[in-house]
Amino acid sequence: MAKAKFERTKPHVNIGTIGHVDHGKTTLTAAITTVLAKQGKAEAKAYDQIDAAPEERERGITISTAHVEYETEARHYAHVDCPGHADYVKNMITGAAQMDGAILVVSAADGPMPQTREHILLSRQVGVPYIVVFLNKCDMVDDEELLELVEMEVRDLLSEYDFPGDEVPVIKGSALKALEGDPKWEEKIIELMNAVDEYIPTPQREVDKPFMMPIEDVFSITGRGTVATGRVERGTLKVGDPVEIIGLSDEPKATTVTGVEMFRKLLDQAEAGDNIGALLRGVSRDEVERGQVLAKPGSITPHTKFKAQVYVLTKEEGGRHTPFFSNYRPQFYFRTTDVTGIITLPEGVEMVMPGDNVEMTVELIAPIAIEEGTKFSIREGGRTVGAGSVSEIIE
């Protein structure tokens, strides 16, 4: 059979399954592919094909993640499923799998459990914007009232973490029965995917967001001016566009892009993903440096103090061997550069052990262009000891 061509006709959405261990995340992932395969919209994947997730490295951290893809009438989906709880924590904090929405799997027989709560909190902290609930194993619960009770508990838990618990779609089903081909339960998988189609909005494409490019290198071209190079992270850039140089100094510097080059050829416009050089009007070589960003004026601002959700590497992952305390001063690596910062742990948390996942407040010694959801690494003497995601800007 010839290899099928990837059709880019449908909008693309990234989703994933989250929830407590053994509540049925991987079985549900298998059931979705199997049910959709009958409509010719997916390749059926068995449980053990998904469970044997390959290891990947993201920011120096090893994470096991399974990726499957499938389609509905409306959209094309990339779906991530992680075998272990630690993989979810690392995945969400590093942004290895950026989710536009998540399917929270809760066993109707057990109700919400500790990792149910932790995954909802992580979703809130790292900016997973929408959650749809699949109450699994409903074939094992005969009591209708018990199902309603579990549903209420899940809705309350979502509301507690600022998700709209009353509005979130809750589908009651059985992933295993659907996987085995029981039509009554297969119908619930279709219902779930309809809810995902309708409730989780299609994300804005990177190209449509305001322009931003982290600066990797700077050089001057005699007679022409200063060029900043880097990979466009989002948006588009045209010759003549006004931009700001942001970070590492108190005030952003305004300038205009007078030329855009890619592979030594002149371009009219660059877009997200392109590696370019931008010629900056009236900027001297010493006014711009690696670690700053070029951005659409007013779209992103420099900050020094923020709250973040952080995963601390274990010593097996190449991290620290010992815990750290408040006032720890490592390097925070944002995009292209390291900046020293001082850590303050939350009240009641005395120290952080390797392998922990913790919220902390960070104060940088120089301002950096950041916003909620910006990812960073924590480094010590050049090696990565943690990974984080900005959850709230303080100043």
Swiss-Prot record:
GO terms for cellular component: cytosol. Residues 19-26 are annotated as: G1. It catalyses: GTP + H2O = GDP + phosphate + H(+). Its main location: cytoplasm. Residues 174-176 are annotated as: G5. Mg(2+) binds at residue 26. Residues 60-64 are annotated as: G2. Its EC number is 3.6.5.3. GTP binds at residues 19-26, 81-85, 136-139. It is found in: Cytoplasm. Residues 136-139 are annotated as: G4. Residues 81-84 are annotated as: G3. PROSITE patterns: G_TR_1 (PS00301), G_TR_2 (PS51722). Keywords: Cytoplasm, Elongation factor, GTP-binding, Hydrolase, Magnesium, Metal-binding, Nucleotide-binding, Protein biosynthesis. Residues 10-204 form the tr-type G domain. One of its GO terms (molecular function) is translation elongation factor activity. GTP hydrolase that promotes the GTP-dependent binding of aminoacyl-tRNA to the A-site of ribosomes during protein biosynthesis. NCBIfam families: EF-Tu (TIGR00485), PRK00049.1 (NF000766), PRK12735.1 (NF009372), PRK12736.1 (NF009373), small_GTP (TIGR00231). Monomer. Belongs to the TRAFAC class translation factor GTPase superfamily. Classic translation factor GTPase family. EF-Tu/EF-1A subfamily. This is Elongation factor Tu. The lineage of its organism: Bacteria, Bacillati, Bacillota, Bacilli, Bacillales.
